[in-house]
Amino acid sequence: MSRREDGRLDDELRPVRITRGFTSHPAGSVLVEFGETRVMCTASVTEGVPRWRKGTGQGWLTAEYAMLPAATHDRSDRESVKGRVGGRTQEISRLIGRSLRACIDLNALGENTIAIDCDVLQADGGTRTAAITGAYVALADAVTYLAAAEKLSDPRPLSCAIAAVSVGVVDGRVRVDLPYSEDSRAEVDMNVVATDTGTLVEIQGTGEGATFPRSTLDKLLDLALASCDQLFVVQREALDAPYPGALPEPTSPPKKAFGS
């Protein structure tokens, strides 16, 4: 099998690295790297929920995505300077929020909000899928923080892990984890969000330059799910280490041992 421009096989991910505790203030903070794509993902906990959620006893999770002006070769203006958030930014923000809400029991949060912020420091394709993969780890750390603060009605509100990856058809070949040089000329481009239980959260796929048959779709999904399995391993290895900061001290008195 011939190799790609960066030396990888068609079914090979770029080197993936997840660094927890990247910044010190949020409950969860992660730097995720897929090759040259680097995204900072944070999970901040705030008291209260949106107005339409008040009085339900349920929490909420929301997400925002943005790219730094110099994340790509050509600098782009900040959207705050333009005075409006672009359609692509809104779409990806909503995708990240939907993906992470699929794995958490919002009832367990009480009326608290977890705000996910994904900021692309450097873009080389696959920024939204890298953001989802890293944001899950930041979310897991935020849940650990909430548990230590005794704000969870269920100490284990996460039902599964979430990861995402890009797949596509480039030069007639099914490939995974497309860098910009491949993504920009792909005949088929797809993003897949999956759980570690083998189910799908979301599929975004388009024929950029041509239509494609069902058999190609099956190959793309098989490759995406196999690659997500590898990402789940990276996530678990990152989360095996202790929480990378100071946890709040419990406020309730310790329970007395039976018979004491």
Swiss-Prot record:
Domain of life from the UniProt record: Bacteria
Amino-acid positions noted as binding phosphate in the UniProt annotation, renumbered to this chain: 88, 126-128
Name of the protein: Ribonuclease PH
Database matches in HAMAP family: RNase_PH
EC identifiers of the protein: 2.7.7.56
Enzymatic reactions: tRNA(n+1) + phosphate = tRNA(n) + a ribonucleoside 5'-diphosphate
Function: Phosphorolytic 3'-5' exoribonuclease that plays an important role in tRNA 3'-end maturation. Removes nucleotide residues following the 3'-CCA terminus of tRNAs; can also add nucleotides to the ends of RNA molecules by using nucleoside diphosphates as substrates, but this may not be physiologically important. Probably plays a role in initiation of 16S rRNA degradation (leading to ribosome degradation) during starvation.
One GO BP: tRNA processing
Keyword set includes Cytoplasm: no
Keywords: Nucleotidyltransferase, RNA-binding, rRNA processing, Transferase, tRNA processing, tRNA-binding
GO-annotated molecular function: 3'-5'-RNA exonuclease activity; tRNA binding; tRNA nucleotidyltransferase activity
Lineage start: Bacteria, Bacillati, Actinomycetota, Actinomycetes, Mycobacteriales
Gene expressing this chain: rph
Entry's family note: Belongs to the RNase PH family.
Quaternary structure (record): Homohexameric ring arranged as a trimer of dimers.
